[in-house]
Amino acid sequence: MTLLIILILKYLLCLENLKNISLQISKNNTINNINCENNFNNINKSYSINESNSAKNDFVKFLKFIFFHAF
C-alpha cells in the first residue's frame, strides 16, 4: 500500500514537473518570438534609414555635379 502511494506521488510530481517545463518552454518561445520581431523591426528601421541617407547622398552628389559643371 505504501509503495502504491509513493508511486502515485511520484507520478503526480512528474506531471507537475512536466507542466512546469512546458510553461517554461512556452515562455521562452514567446520571449524568442518577441526578440525576433524586435530584431526584424530594428533591421527594417536601420535599412530604411540607410536607404534614406543613400538617397540624400545621391541627390547631393547630383546637385554638386550640376553646380560644378554649370559654372
UniProtKB/Swiss-Prot annotation:
Q: Can you tell me which residues are glycosylated? A: 20, 28, 44, 50
Q: Which UniProt keywords apply?
A: Glycoprotein, Secreted, Signal
Q: What is its main location?
A: secreted
**May I have one GO cellular component term?**
extracellular region
UniProt signal peptide: 1-23
Where is the protein localized? Secreted
Q: Which domain of life is it from?
A: Eukaryota
> Which protein is depicted?
Putative uncharacterized protein DDB_G0291626
Please give the organism.
Dictyostelium discoideum (Social amoeba)
